[in-house]
Design a protein with these regions (language model features):
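N-terminal Lys/Arg-rich, disordered targeting/topogenic segments
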Residues: 1-10
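A short, surface-exposed interaction/processing loop segment used at functional sites
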Residues: 117-153
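Ser/Thr/Pro/Gly-rich low-complexity linker/stalk segments immediately outside membranes or between
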Residues: 4, 33-47
Length: 153
């Protein structure tokens, strides 16, 4: 049987305990920050809820979607949804929560995009009546995809 002894002053023991407590506090604080903001829960199960949500962001759209389709995500995100999820995370959504599930995509014609020369659409992805993701797509020569926030300016 081995017995190991170490001689430490009380001051050294206190320093070690303080460092340990500081590291534990830092770990718990970082963990709490990472999980402190739950994803937004935005009701989008009905056409009226979807249009009202878009209107709350400043968008005016036609009263019916021009396209509705089902999208089934894989068990893990792969391209193009992996890159698309970066856009979603920037606006508070996260498609990884919906891996393995089927989402409905509703596409609306945007009627008030600031640059009226660009035809634009709003895509909303809904799962179980809750908004899972969304984007604004402007097509044409200089087309692009952006988040749902109304452009400033």
């Amino acid at each position: 049987m081995f017995i190991i002894t170490a001689k430490c002053s009380k001051l050294r023991v206190v320093k070690i305990l303080l460092i340990f407590a500081l590291l534990l506090s830092l770990f718990l604080a970082l963990r709490a920050c990472r999980h402190s903001s739950p994803p937004p829960v935005i009701a989008a199960g009905t056409n009226e809820e979807r249009i009202a949500y878009l209107a709350s962001l400043g968008w005016e759209v036609n009263d019916q979607p021009i396209e509705t389709l089902s999208v089934t995500l894989g068990e893990t995100l792969e391209e193009p949804y992996l890159s698309y999820n970066d856009l979603q995370r920037s606006q508070g959504f996260d498609l990884t929560r919906y891996c393995g599930q089927t989402l409905s995509r509703y596409t609306y014609v945007v009627t008030n995009y600031p640059d009226a020369s660009l035809p634009c659409q709003a895509d909303l992805y809904v799962c179980d009546g809750v908004l899972a993701a969304g984007d604004i797509v402007c097509t044409g020569e200089n087309g692009f995809m952006a988040g749902l926030a109304f452009p400033a300016g």
